[in-house]
Amino acid sequence: ALTFLEEQPQVDPNRLGVYGHSMGGKLTVLTTGSDDRVKAAAPSCGGISDRYNTDPLFRTTIGDDVYLSRIRCPMFFLSPANDFHGRINDLQEAIREVQSPEVRMNCAPHHNHQDTPDYEVATQLWFDQHLKKNFEVPETPSTKLMLREKRRPRFILVPDRSREILSVDVYYTQQGEIVDGPGNMDNTKNRFWHHVKATPGKADWLADISFVNPNRPLWIYANVNYPLEKEVIGAGYYYGIYKADHFTISSPMTMLDSDRLKKLGLADTFKTSAIIEDFSEGWEKEWFHYRENEWARKTHKVYEPRWQAPDGAMLSFEVRTREENTLVVGIDHFAAEVKINGGEDWQKIVLNPGQFTDADGAVLKGWGKIKELRYGPSETVRSKERGSKKRKSFGGPWKGVKPQLRDLRWGVK
């Protein structure tokens, strides 16, 4: 492919770039690590985690680490924090293995194998800098985690201030697995990332970590968000067109195991909470979506021990919308429809597991081991039976403005 491009009259053979998503991300790394005609590359969701295969032939021919260590051109890794194919802990190895002095990354919290425009746009900006020479991507922020005896951890970040900074968001999880191979997919795809909004100082930004259990590992990183002078339009994942007015640069992730946290005498500030979401300012940072123009949201809060359901609990929340509607609430591959009366008054909704059904008509047996909570106007769930093509749709078109929600919690009868 590179040779073909070199021979085209409209192509500058000295400015060839490679990017790809998923298996295309792996192929980006393999191509870039084997051909120095590539002048810049941007692998997405791949090319960093094929390092666990013990077969000698695999390890020496198509293992990701073999090719990463041969790369010397500028690299930008697009690596969602919960991606199953390019795992965020392996990214930390990858950025050390690459031999290029020009390496950046972005890591969308909660996302698995998809991204939103503020992350997707990085590929275009990277090539604008290194192939077109008409843009400058900020440097990777430097970070330091202060662990203070009997006090809360403090994360300190020094971002590149060559551009205006919109905000700095710190994310941490205590559900990371240090040995995180392909056999641990549930954790990889569903671990919950707590959000802390960093506050600016004279040169750095600070974030104090509120809830920490020293008996569990701690993974923490930061996203620095920058505005774009003008909107950028491009082709994103799965052939979708995106429009971005800002972009994100991530820091490397600090990873500490529980033994180190305990040795340091870190204060145990972990507390369980029946309140899953209070919908106060910034709440959406701990929820996620993939479609910018829709209001449906998802979260992995219910997978985190802090918000796991107590025995005999009911899921409750209050909702208000002007029009009569049907709201869909989803739990993993189950869903339930909720009738909303409409009007100015808040309506309390109480749900038990038996109200949630799957594509095969089975009901949710309990809240134990649930991983994802969702709400939206409609959704289709798919059967988990091997070989089954059964699907079941819930909800439908929404009337009027999006709903308001408050006081999402576990309640006991």
Label each residue range with its predicted role.
Residues 98-115:
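Catalytic histidine neighborhood in serine/cysteine hydrolases
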Residues 229-272, 399, 404-412:
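Short beta-strand elements
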Residues 275, 287-369, 374-391, 398-404, ...:
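Extracellular ligand-binding interfaces
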